[in-house]
Amino acid sequence: MDSFKTLQEHKETIRLFMEYGVPGEFAEPAAALLDKFEADIIGLNLFHNFYSCLPEGTEDAIEKLLLLARKQGVFLLCASSFSGTNYLYLVNNEGAVLLGTLAEGLPDRKLLDFFGFKDNESFLALGKDLSCIEEYEISPADRSLCPACQAAVGEYHILGCPVEICPWCNGQLTRCNCRFTRLDVENFDRESQIEKLQERLDTEGRLPFAKEHSPGYPSDVLSDEGDETGVRRQESGDRSKKNF
């Protein structure tokens, strides 16, 4: 995903894509939905993926977002379009990935295990009646979620999250020197170093997110990092190297 300096810039880019991809009769409700999530990076990331590369290659618009599952700052969302198709997206603070349609299910075994589904059949059963699935609603001021990586209370942060507390000194993990001294390195410029740091953190005992860790305003943390789009997924090293 492209890097955006502000959420407003992110929104305006999406709006530009919408001008070319949204049918006229759906322009108003589609714009209203975008406005609703203008301060929510998860919603904006999904919109950006959808409108920048329309799934079917034809004009369409998102009518509503449904929350299928959420874990450790990763959201499994259904984007119901005005054309009647329900698209399945994997979303976090860094971006969104189209997985297919809800009718196709979630065939990836790792994703099924991650979100706690027994098999694809059990996942498909979830989508049989969309009226029973709650709409995705989130406030950036929700203190039960990490304002930077969206991990819920009791869950581990995405590695590199600026809110995570260091288990060795109780300082801010991305700012204290423990990550360097524990590995006896001066900087992190290789994937193997990031992986080794995670192993050390797991051994020591990472501190899961707690409400008292949350700053007064999400922008306080995000602005310190200079990027309101959040942190990169753990398996991607570029941003991890930047934060570590």
Segments the model singles out, each with a brief description of its role:
Residues 114-226:
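Cys/His-clustered metal-coordination modules, chiefly Zn-binding fingers
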Residues 2-132:
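Long, charged N-terminal interaction/targeting segments
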